[in-house]
């Protein structure tokens, strides 16, 4: 499969030509990103989203897993959910991710983020988490991919990219948008507890500002 998706790049961006002016370039990229968000929402299963929200709210601990560009998406998710006062972690090192996964239990949740759904480190880390008893949520662009076979809940994005270019911005925009929806839904359902967490964490960094 890896050989099939690795093809020589023939352009900097699929929809942009070398003759495009800056204003046209701006409009094309903006339209593409807006289309990505719209298509992701159309693809999103409300039932899967509600189940993911309930799992996260009731979890003792949540671990976000991802490598490469998706690893930084996982770190962003960690920051968001920490603000709510939840026990959350994410790490860029694949070995530490594996160790964290085997230490999860039945009341914990693992969230695997992989645009292609075929990233070996992320898939295997999610498999370790599942074998340890944790529930697994995956965020991916491909419904038929290895990561969905180990996930209890699948949340799909709709970025128009090849797996080779999973570091491009449209895939990250889709992932961040989906995580923002998930975060907000969790916060609303937590109600006062979420507000307490937000106020507590805001005070913790208040003296970091001039």
Regions found by a protein language model. Name each.
Residues 57-177, 181-191:
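Glycine-rich phosphate-binding loops that contact phosphosugars or nucleotide phosphates
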């Amino acid at each position: 499969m890896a050989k099939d998706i690795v093809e020589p790049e023939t352009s900097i961006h699929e929809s942009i030509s070398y003759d495009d002016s800056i204003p046209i370039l701006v409009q094309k990229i903006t339209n593409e990103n807006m289309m990505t968000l719209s298509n992701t929402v159309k693809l999103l299963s409300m039932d899967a989203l509600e189940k993911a929200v309930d799992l996260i709210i009731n979890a003792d601990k949540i671990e976000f897993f991802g490598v490469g560009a998706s690893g930084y998406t996982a770190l962003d998710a960690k920051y968001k959910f920490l603000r709510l006062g939840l026990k959350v972690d994410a790490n860029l090192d694949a070995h530490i991710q594996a160790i964290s996964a085997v230490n999860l239990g039945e009341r914990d949740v693992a969230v695997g983020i992989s645009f292609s759904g075929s990233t070996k480190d992320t898939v295997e880390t999610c498999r370790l988490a599942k074998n340890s008893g944790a529930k697994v949520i995956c965020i991916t662009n491909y419904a038929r991919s290895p990561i969905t076979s180990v996930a209890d809940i699948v949340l799909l994005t709709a970025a128009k990219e090849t797996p080779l270019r999973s570091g491009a911005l449209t895939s990250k925009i889709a992932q961040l948008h989906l995580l923002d929806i998930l975060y907000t839904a969790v916060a609303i359902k937590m109600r006062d507890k979420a507000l307490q967490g937000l106020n507590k964490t805001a005070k913790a960094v208040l003296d970091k500002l001039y």
